[in-house]
Regions:
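TPR repeat positional signature
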Residues: 3, 10, 29-30, 45, ...
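Conserved small-residue packing positions in alpha-helical repeats and bundles
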Residues: 7, 14-17, 34, 47, ...
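Short, charge-rich amphipathic alpha-helical segments embedded
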Residues: 24-61, 187-201
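Hydrophobic/aromatic side-chain positions at a characteristic register within alpha-helices
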Residues: 11, 15-19, 25, 38, ...
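Extended alpha-helical scaffolding regions
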Residues: 83-137
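Extended, charged low-complexity segments
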Residues: 147-213
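Alpha-helical linker/edge segments of TPR/alpha-solenoid repeat scaffolds
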Residues: 51-76, 208-213
Length: 213
């Protein structure tokens, strides 16, 4: 399928930003191109876009994870709050919607962050983690950090991986392929930092393209 000039322009801008390592600008343009291509059922075109998006988000993640600490956030998330690159653990009284706003505000200000949102401990002593997007809610439960006041980088990394794995488990392989594509896109909207979800989306787009032949 031939791309529209608008979609190709978005991809060109994304690729230019990628060359400049302007990862957040690249991400924004790849996302626009992905949404427009999905609207046209251009599955083959989406595969290339997803790969570009994966690279851009890897760049964002690399910059966000340079700082070797985890910042705990339990106060209001606002557009004017003090933000710097790094890892953020959003915790009560804040909720998943606050974590999503934090990601959105950081992108708007061109600040690379990685975000995990936790909920209160369960009776079993586990910590629920959550990620949300419109129409998508993903939850999992993990072991708490040894020191809840100072969660380690390793614990944070494990939490990011766990919520991504939980998202993958929500994808039913027996579901119609275009529905799976949309479900994975929703998961990526909630968890932009998970690389296996990008791989799964590309694979599912390939399946959709083959079915369309």
């Amino acid at each position: 399928m031939t791309r529209t000039k608008q979609i190709q322009g978005q991809i060109d801008r994304a690729l230019e930003a990628t060359r400049d390592e302007s990862w957040i600008v690249a991400e924004a343009n790849f996302l626009k191109a992905l949404a427009a291509s999905r609207g046209r059922n251009d599955w083959q075109g989406m595969i290339e876009i997803v790969e570009g998006l994966r690279v851009a988000r890897r760049g964002i993640r690399r910059k966000a994870l340079v700082r070797g600490t985890v910042r705990i956030l339990d106060e209001s998330v606002t557009e004017t709050m003090d933000l710097s690159p790094g890892r953020y653990l959003v915790q009560p009284p804040l909720v998943g919607a606050d974590a999503r706003r934090l990601i959105q505000f950081s992108r708007e200000r061109n600040i690379p962050v990685a975000v995990v949102c936790r909920e209160p401990r369960t009776r079993a002593g586990l910590i629920p983690i959550v990620a949300i997007a419109p129409g998508t809610t993903i939850r999992d439960q993990i072991q708490p950090p040894a020191n809840e006041a100072k969660p380690t980088v390793a614990w944070f990394k494990g939490a990011l991986e766990a919520i991504g794995e939980a998202a993958l488990e929500t994808i039913d392989p027996s579901e119609e392929v275009t529905r799976r594509v949309d479900r994975i896109i929703g998961c990526l909207d909630a968890i932009p930092d998970n690389e296996p979800l990008h791989v799964k989306l590309a694979e599912t787009c390939e399946e959709a393209a083959q079915n369309a032949v």
